[in-house]
Amino acid sequence: MDMESVAASIRAGGVVIYPTETLYALGCDARDASACARLAALKGRPESKPFPLIVADMAGLRALLAPLPKPLEIDLALLATRFWPGPLSVLLPTRPELPTLVRDSQGLSSVRITPHPLATELCRRVGGALVATSANVSGRPATADPGQLDPALLAGTEGALLAEPWPAGGEPSTL
């Protein structure tokens, strides 16, 4: 699928596979509770384990966040300057209207600003944060190689963005 087809699928409530800076991700619109539930079932992941999120930029991040105390705002600005965009995920208080599948019991979500150009563009075209969990069934290995994506997982999605630049491989994002 091309970028616009994948973005349209996400906007329509779909689940897709797309590249990130490290691995292929299984994702959907982070604001769509039904899509998040479908993704959890497809991945075989317990609903008690919230999904990590990616955003395109600080504006995308701020749209997710609950009001922050001033000291946390300052720390976040320093962190962002030093580590983002990049594979560092941070637990931050997010808006209560987000689905429970992307927030823990304390209202925190794992979020990062992705440096991958296709993932960044996908966030922009969707207009918000994306779920970014590894594109594998829970307990199975994740991959940076499009040829190694699980055919059954692919079949359970609306499609995949398999275009360059490919994921670089290596460790998933650090929390």
Q: Which residue ranges define each predicted feature?
A:
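Active-site-adjacent structural elements in enzyme catalytic cores
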Residues: 1-175
